[in-house]
Amino acid sequence: MLKCILLLLCVALNAPLASAKETLHIYAASSMTNAVNALVADYSQQHDVKLVTVYGGSSSLARQIEAGAPADLFISANEEWANYLVEKGLVKPNKVVTLAANSLVLIRPTAQPVASFELQDAAAWQTALADSRLAVAQVDAVPAGMYAKQALQHAGVWPELESRLAQTNNVRLALALVERGESPLGIVYKTDALLSDKVTIVMAFSAQSHLPIRYPLAQLNDKAANAEWLAYLRSDAAQQILQRFGFESVSE
């Protein structure tokens, strides 16, 4: 009996340490879902590391990380929430890099055409919305909503539209409202609009109408796997994947 126990112990001690595979937890803005999934799939073919992804609104993810969520990397849809973690002492300032850029568009359900109108025409907005609401992410917390508010303010129609909003917890939920026809118009990222054949882009907002839409990537610790993942993201292969999903490259 003792020999059996010793034999089993030796086998256990010499067995491959499958559980020792390093794990990276990547917390990323909802608008990055499809692109990050593709990046993870490509990276996993070449590296022996487990990548766990968590998606949501940047504000929600930042607060989860502040509360102790086990994130190794955080991809925000704006600089504010990455800076928030820097201010909280959870990320060093030199551990934040810009991953990609995006743009903002107005969308409608593909099956529900709307008459063309000028962004500055408040009456035309009211006519297009009729008895419904404009789908946007939360304008005071979620980056996509914050950019939408800035764009509407720039167009001079914010006072008329502020009470006509259907605000959601993240940009993908705003997209879904338009996809289902529950909102006749919505403001989302170009990358989100390109993913759905259920919505059509009505027009794009000028880059001057809102702050630059940048995606900072914050490194929360010094795991060796973090450095390898970051090096991969700078590669041509990773940049091509991001561009395939409509993201724009950014020079640091």
What feature does the model see in each segment?
Residues 20-46, 52-55, 59, 63-69, ...:
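Exported/periplasmic ABC-transporter solute-binding proteins
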